A protein has these predicted regions:
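Hydrophobic helix-coil surface modules that form long, contiguous segments used
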Residues: 68, 163-167, 174-335, 364-367, ...
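A surface-exposed beta-strand-loop module
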Residues: 89-151, 174, 210-212, 544-551
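Catalytic Zn2+-binding segment of zinc metalloproteases
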Residues: 338-353
Length: 698
């Protein structure tokens, strides 16, 4: 699922598509769950589990209500006199259980959103079918079954969609609405004959009905979690093509097919790549990318299996007005949601503790596949700003481990955050770089093969990685996923003799808040290199210096390629050597060294003079626009700190001296073939220099 893109402008101007629940929709605030006992999850009883749902839906879009029936094939595992499942804002009018003559008594618990069916006698273990007739509401915000209105050619029109993650399938049908309670689903819908109905699977058959209606029967889904079920209805058109034997389509409101081509092309690129990378072909016969009218609410897209929902701004590209940045944004959101078709849909976390298995992997994979097909977009460079945001969040007192205990669904809704998405992605990249791309991919393939259609915990993934490696992957992964915070690697010494640099480093803790300074120990995979030489790998842990032998005698980069999740603290001499050769570093290393030096200086863990000296090199350095934008952001931050002080004028003069020459090189006018990042940089420089009272832009 993609969160509302609240970090796009600040950290990845063109393409960051970070989006999931930030807040619950206010009009749909859930009833508070009952307080969980310490360390105890609020979950449904294990005595009865679902196997298959047959749902028959009749929505009334105008009245914003629906009625439905569901037959749930269940397995009773131990004697019990009740069946408990999830239901919210649903009225159950009739209930019956196969083999039981008397109807059960139905009671509701609004706090924990359950319905309980009590029977006169205990049910024996075995298979049963629970049949229910019920009715519910169609919401006007994205929760459960909801409506989106728009102005069409013939006036106001209404579309219907579903949004169930993390726990709103219970608003659509009584169900075992937990990720670990997988089952198969078969949906039938009675809808207007002139509208298109959509679900996870293709249509099996359609029956014409009186009164301008039709009855649409969808094929049965594979075994999946309830939050992935989808239904859509509206005046749609669909463009599609065959990709690796899968019918891939983009669904838009009527008249918008000209804007669907870019997303369809993107999906056609990405699907074969994922089929190969995961080693398990996409298992459904069709994959739809569905554009909902309007802009995002509290999320941008949702990975319903075979029926991915997007708001239009995250999927459609108007060839007449869309920018290259718009295309990058759409491409990466498409990549994110398609990655979920494996990480999240085919293999699903057993409970919300391990949500990062869905979101961290999709966030990492979106960048990996985008860079594969569009290296010219430099998305890994832009991704460093996402990692920067994650580190600044993770260095605060209020952070939490990637794998964190979740006791109820309300708490689960709060887990869709920067730690789950951005730190999760950064840690995956750390481990892939340390283990190697081929070995890491082999572990992912084993994981997909062994756990297809099932549920997992994080250690299931690490065990697959350990099977193919002599390196301590599980131990390292535990340090980064089970404890919060940001490790720091400090350059203790570096001496070159005979063409080999003897480097010594220590491991510490980068923290912003005073309460975050408790000593923590990580096993940190470090990939260090001297400028222009091959890197060396080592695992660094604790304050005792760890020696690393590096080829060459140039400046040392502690996080060569910036693929690992840690802060690098250089000695003053080490940073001066880097600054003297700054232009020879890759843009990734330029940005990583700059971010680390600035962040450490801000919290007093490195001299501010070192940061200012490094910043001054940008007067003459022809750096990548993404790097220079980061410099401008940092200078803006410093200017805020000087607000109202006599020294602010002197600082602004110094800042003008750094950014003014950069703006002179960029100029006022767009150059032929100029990148979007350069255009964004121009606007950023004009704004910053204006703040710094530069007459050249005033």
């Amino acid at each position: 699922m993609k969160l509302k893109t609240i970090f796009r402008q600040a950290y990845r101007p063109a393409i960051l598509a970070f989006a999931v629940f930030v807040v619950q929709p206010p009009a749909l605030a859930r009833a508070a769950d009952a307080p969980a006992a310490a360390g105890q999850r609020i979950v449904l009883p294990a005595a009865v589990t679902p196997d298959h749902y047959r749902i028959d839906l009749t929505p009334d879009a105008k009245a914003l209500t629906y009625k439905a029936t569901v037959q749930i094939d269940v397995s009773v595992h131990q004697p019990t006199d009740r069946i408990v499942l999830n239901a919210a804002d649903i009225v159950i009018d009739k209930a019956a259980l196969s083999g039981e003559a008397a109807a059960p008594t139905v009671s509701y618990d609004a706090k924990v959103q359950t319905a309980t069916f009590a029977f006169a006698r205990a049910l024996k273990p075995g298979p049963y079918t629970l049949s229910l007739a019920y009715r519910g509401k169609i919401y006007q915000q994205a929760s459960g079954l909801f409506a989106l209105d728009y102005d069409g050619a013939g006036g106001k029109k209404r579309t219907l969609f579903t949004q169930f993650e993390n726990s709103d399938a219970r608003r659509f049908t009584p169900s075992w609405d937990e990720p670990g309670r997988k089952a198969t689903f078969q949906l039938t819908a009675t809808v207007p004959a002139d509208e298109m109905a959509l679900s996870n699977m293709p249509i099996a058959s359609t029956d014409a009905l009186p009164g301008g209606l039709k009855r649409v029967h969808f094929k049965e889904t594979p075994k999946m979690s309830s939050y992935l079920l989808f239904f859509g209805l509206g005046d749609f058109e669909r463009v599609h093509r065959d990709v690796d034997g899968v019918d891939v389509g983009v669904v838009v409101k009527r008249g918008d097919t000209a804007s669907a081509g870019f997303a369809l092309d993107a999906a056609a690129h990405i699907l074969p790549y994922y089929n190969d990378y995961f080693g398990t072909p996409f298992p459904l016969p069709k994959l739809d990318l569905i554009a909902g009218p309007g802009s995002s609410q509290f999320f941008g897209a949702m990975e319903n299996w075979g029926a991915i929902f997007y708001f239009e701004r995250d999927l459609l590209i108007d060839p007449r007005v869309s920018t290259q940045g718009d295309k990058q944004g759409v491409y990466i959101v498409v990549a994110h949601e398609m990655a979920h078709q494996w990480f999240g849909d085919l293999v699903t976390m057993a409970w919300w503790d391990d949500l990062w298995l869905n979101e961290g992997f999709a966030s990492w994979m979106e960048t990996k596949v985008t860079d594969h097909f569009h290296p010219e977009w430099k998305v890994w460079l832009q991704d460093l700003q996402a990692k920067q945001f994650a580190m600044e969040t993770d260095a605060r007192d209020g952070t939490h481990p990637i794998v964190t205990p979740i006791y109820d669904v309300l708490q689960a809704a709060g887990a869709f955050d920067a730690i789950t998405y951005l730190k999760g992605a950064a840690v995956i990249r750390t481990l892939e770089s340390y283990l190697g791309e081929d070995a890491f991919r082999a572990g992912v393939r084993r994981y997909m093969h062994d756990h297809a259609y099932g549920n997992t915990v994080t250690d299931d993934l690490w065990s697959e990685m350990d099977r193919g490696s002599a390196r301590p992957i599980t131990q390292i992964a535990h340090d980064f996923t089970l404890q919060a915070g940001v490790p720091m690697i400090t350059q203790a010494s570096a001496k070159c003799e005979g063409g080999v640099t003897s480097l010594a480093v220590t491991q510490g803790h980068y923290a912003i808040d005073p309460g975050s300074t408790t000593a923590r120990v990580w096993r940190v995979p470090v990939i260090a290199a001297t400028l222009g030489a091959a890197p060396a790998k080592a695992v660094v842990s604790g304050e005792r210096p760890t020696p690393i032998a590096l080829a060459g005698c140039g400046p040392v980069v502690l996080n060569a390629g910036q693929t690992a999740y840690f802060r690098s603290r250089y000695s003053t001499d080490g940073l001066a050597a880097i600054a003297a050769h700054y232009g020879a570093l890759s843009p990734d290393d330029q940005l990583g060294v700059f971010n680390d030096t600035a962040s450490l200086a801000y919290v007093g863990q490195a001299p501010m003079a070192d940061f200012l000296d490094l910043t001054a090199t940008f007067k003459t350095l022809a750096a990548d626009p993404v790097v220079v934008q980061a410099v401008g952001d940092r200078l803006d931050d410093l200017d805020t700190l000087y607000e109202g002080l006599p020294s602010q004028a002197a600082f602004r003069a110094w800042a003008r001296g750094v950014l003014g020459p950069v703006f002179a090189r960029v100029g006022w006018d767009k150059a032929p073939g100029e990148s979007d990042n350069t255009a964004l940089l121009r606007a950023r420089l004009i704004g910053a220099l204006g703040d710094f009272d530069d007459p050249a832009v005033l």
